[in-house]
């Protein structure tokens, strides 16, 4: 929930005026915002923005965002404990190999593709994904 809240907040600046894609057909500021965001963000990004806006909305902020921040603190502390004994945490970048464009459209499956990358985002630790090989299905996979 924290990552969607942060994505919603961060992506709000992509208005087509100062940042991000700018729609060419808009005639006014309001239309520029609407068209730029409609054309510039794909369905998955829009879903995550909406989920993040929900998490940050009145009545849900404490239920989700505040509790999520507490979980983040626990995760940060546990990660620091791990780094006392180990120099690196090696994880696959995603739980599956890459998939063909538009092959995965289920929102839950798409969201779960981030399961291994979200750790570094939540704890504030640096991470990089590197190509690791090619699966027998011909699709690449990586580690981070």
State where each predicted segment sits.
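Glycine-rich, small-residue loops and helix-cap segments
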Residues: 3-9, 13, 18-144
């Amino acid at each position: 929930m924290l990552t969607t809240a942060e994505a919603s907040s961060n992506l709000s600046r992509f208005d087509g005026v100062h940042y991000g894609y700018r729609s060419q057909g808009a005639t006014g500021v309001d239309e520029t915002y609407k068209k730029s965001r409609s054309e510039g963000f794909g369905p998955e990004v829009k879903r995550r923005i909406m989920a993040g806006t929900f998490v940050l909305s009145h009545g849900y902020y404490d239920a989700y965002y505040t509790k999520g921040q507490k979980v983040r603190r626990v995760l940060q502390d546990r990660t620091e404990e791990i780094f006392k004994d180990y120099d690196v945490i090696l994880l696959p970048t995603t739980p599956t190999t890459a998939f063909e464009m538009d092959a995965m459209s289920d929102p839950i499956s798409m969201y779960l593709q981030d399961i291994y990358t979200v750790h570094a985002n939540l704890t504030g630790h640096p991470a990089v994904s590197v190509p690791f090989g090619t699966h027998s299905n011909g699709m690449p996979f990586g580690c981070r």
